[in-house]
């Protein structure tokens, strides 16, 4: 199963990168690239029915958030997903972290001010 997900992610990476003008943004902790995070979430979440996320979608969102260990990483991830949410093909992703009930997840909302989101997370840490 994980091998097929990997193949799907790589395929999406190759196909969607030029289409989305995706930026290869490295998270500050060096664990992932923006395009790979986008591909992982897109491949897992766009098959949902009626706007309700399924377990694979929630797992993918949790997974990309889990690898971001710093405030700067959260900012990069937030901006990373801002890029694809501007595209009408990916509006189904809006609000998915909340629907999956993932605490402190980077919001998927094109109206999110990523700097304010990170500031809010920073304040919760202290």
Curated annotation (Swiss-Prot):
Segments traversing the membrane: none
CDD domains in the record: nsLTP1
GO molecular function, one term: lipid binding
Keyword Nucleotide-binding: no
Signal sequence, start to end: 1-22
InterPro entries in UniProt: Bifun_inhib/LTP/seed_sf
Family the entry assigns: Belongs to the plant LTP family.
Function: Plant non-specific lipid-transfer proteins transfer phospholipids as well as galactolipids across membranes. May play a role in wax or cutin deposition in the cell walls of expanding epidermal cells and certain secretory tissues.
Protein name in UniProt: Non-specific lipid-transfer protein 15
Species: Arabidopsis thaliana (Mouse-ear cress)
Gene name of the encoded protein: LTP15
């Amino acid at each position: 199963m994980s091998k097929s997900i990997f193949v799907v992610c790589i395929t999406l990476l190759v196909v969607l990168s030029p289409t989305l003008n995706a930026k290869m943004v490295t998270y500050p902790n060096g664990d992932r690239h923006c395009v790979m995070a986008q591909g992982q979430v897109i491949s897992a979440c766009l098959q949902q029915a009626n706007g309700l996320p399924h377990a694979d979608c929630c797992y993918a969102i949790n997974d990309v958030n889990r690898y971001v260990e710093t405030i700067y990483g959260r900012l990069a991830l937030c901006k990373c997903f801002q890029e694809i949410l501007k595209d009408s093909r990916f509006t189904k992703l809006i609000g998915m972290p909340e629907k999956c009930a993932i605490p402190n997840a980077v919001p998927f909302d094109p109206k999110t001010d990523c700097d304010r989101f990170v500031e809010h997370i920073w304040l919760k840490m202290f």
